[in-house]
Amino acid sequence: MSLGCRERAQAVQGEAELKDMVRRMMPVVAQATGLQFKREPLVLRRSRAQVRDYVIHKFDEDLPPGDLAGLQSALRLFGLIPDSLELRPTMIDLLTEQIAGYYDPDSNALFIPADIDQFQLRMVVSHELVHALQDQYVRLDSIITQRHANDRRAAAQAILEGQATVAQISVLMPEQKPETLPLGLFWRQRAAMAAQQAQMKEFAHAPLWIREGLVFPYLGGADFIIWFRRTYLGRSVLDSMPRSTEQILHPERYRDHDEPTDLSVASGEPDTVRWEDNLGEFETRLLFQQLLGNEPEAATLATGWDGDRYQVLGAQSDVLVWYSVWDDAAAATRFTAGLQRAWAKRRSDSRTAQRSEIKLLTIQGRSVVRLVDAPNDWKGWRALPTVRLSGGAE
């Protein structure tokens, strides 16, 4: 048999074994999630080059050039990534390095890299099978591609990845009952996970916002799922998913139906809106952690978040206007003082032509904080954008 034929035969045999593994694992995954498969997903091998091509395709599909430029400007203005960092190549290299398998909703297929080792294979297949099952009950594409809804999307990703993380424990370690695990266990494993990830070059050199954003859905999401399974026996979390990372971080807010307040920003002086979105409680934590370097303090300062909205404005994308609303005056006052300290550090070595203003306001009877960071000669200083609140604890 020629070398090419032999390699092809081995590939066919490998895919047959993979399909057999999927069929044997499907009932166990169904039992672990409480959901039944409506159809069997496809499963295919892919080379590492094909994995990279997929990452590029999905990244460009999710963030077309205009959106990418807007988001990158926002992250630079907040100080969450360095001005020198180019988001697209950084994320593509990092995701290519990280991905050990993926489920593609468009083709209803699990794709497994050809170079994956046998130790990882069962773990990856069990995890991605959960995503295939989730896609049969909710539209994954519509959830993970919500535009200008960063925090809600992050909360949804935490549910999807958290459920898959918990379910794979039941698949790989049947003797371990997830409901018996201590609450908060997964998030406390971050240090150990970070040590493992530090061996991966792209992850180790990525900014805090990227590193923590990749880890949060798995660990923070898994902790929420453990809580949910204890609190709502027999119910599916997919039927009523959290709407904010606040509800992931503080599950009692989910239980109490504490929904985030929606903010609508209206322009003052005519200007070009380059990007608009929100941070949410989790990324507000990351902002403080990045600027102040103290994780416990960052968590305290972000607690009490009830909603936020920011805009990137100006022809040069050099204006940031950020409104946030808080549960009460105490939380807003604490946040304001923390943001003033953090922003002073942020701008300590900045251009003198940039002006920053942080104010605690009362709008519609609620405690609201406004940050404006813009060039001194920005025309919008004469009539700043305003905000309207709706929903939440109005």
Label each residue range with its predicted role:
Residues 6-8:
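Bacterial signal peptide processing site
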Residues 25, 135-141, 145-194:
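Post-HExxH zinc-binding segment in Zn-dependent metallohydrolases
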Residues 109-126, 149-156:
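Short pre-active-site segment immediately N-terminal to the catalytic Zn-binding motif
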Residues 29, 123-140, 164-165, 328:
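Active-site recognition of the HExxH zinc-binding catalytic motif
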Residues 198-317, 323:
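Pan-zinc metallopeptidase signature
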Residues 306-394:
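C-terminal soluble interaction/assembly domains
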Residues 38-58, 147-151, 182-191, 242-246:
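Acidic helix-start/capping segments at beta-turn-to-alpha-helix junctions
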Residues 20-119:
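Auxiliary, metal-adjacent structural segments of Zn-dependent hydrolase domains
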